[in-house]
């Protein structure tokens, strides 16, 4: 089984308000079921963490770099307040592959070139993910994705990691201002 280049941590979000809770925090629209690529920002619009969000029938899985899992859990718990949500780490293998998307797997939302992701057991070939990621200019947390940078500087728009039509989220005002100041009128 091929696994991502770096270990991944999984957070499970449950509760009746799970979608609305995360929708108000992250850069991408996660209102539909499936796999989404998104980020959490500071109120000043700077990068904190990028991750995948898998919206399922009864819960949401957050697939984040293993090194960011504790800080992301802490930050999300801080925002939880009275929301009817529970956030907890869970064990779930993350597998990736290329070629046709197998049953139970999801196309990588950043670009088709990165293949698919599956949560749970899934057979796949051994792949040099680092070479593939570099060839397709996909930034990696801890390498090219650095804290206190703006996500538009790190190409999140090209990677389908930000939705300019979804409405408010933490840091949205800064991101929108940067986007619209760089467009020709």
Language-model regions, residue ranges each:
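Basic, glycine/lysine-rich polyanion-binding surfaces/domains
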Residues: 1-185
């Amino acid at each position: 089984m091929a696994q991502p280049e770096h270990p991944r941590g999984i957070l499970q979000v449950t509760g009746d308000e799970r979608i609305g809770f995360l929708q108000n925090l992250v850069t991408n629209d996660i209102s539909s079921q499936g796999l989404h690529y998104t980020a959490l920002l500071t109120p000043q619009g700077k990068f904190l963490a990028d991750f995948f969000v898998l919206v399922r029938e009864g819960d949401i899985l957050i697939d984040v770099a293993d090194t960011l899992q504790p800080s992301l859990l802490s930050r999300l718990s801080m925002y939880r307040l009275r929301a009817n949500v529970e956030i907890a780490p869970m064990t779930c293998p993350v597998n990736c592959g290329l070629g046709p998307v197998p049953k139970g797997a999801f196309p990588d939302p950043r670009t088709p070139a990165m293949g698919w992701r599956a949560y749970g057991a899934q057979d796949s070939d051994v792949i040099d993910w680092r070479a593939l990621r570099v060839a397709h200019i996909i930034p990696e947390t801890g390498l090219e994705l650095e804290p206190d940078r703006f996500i538009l500087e790190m190409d999140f728009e090209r990677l389908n990691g930000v939705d300019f039509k979804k409405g408010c989220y933490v840091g949205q005002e800064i991101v929108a201002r940067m986007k619209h100041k760089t467009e020709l009128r």
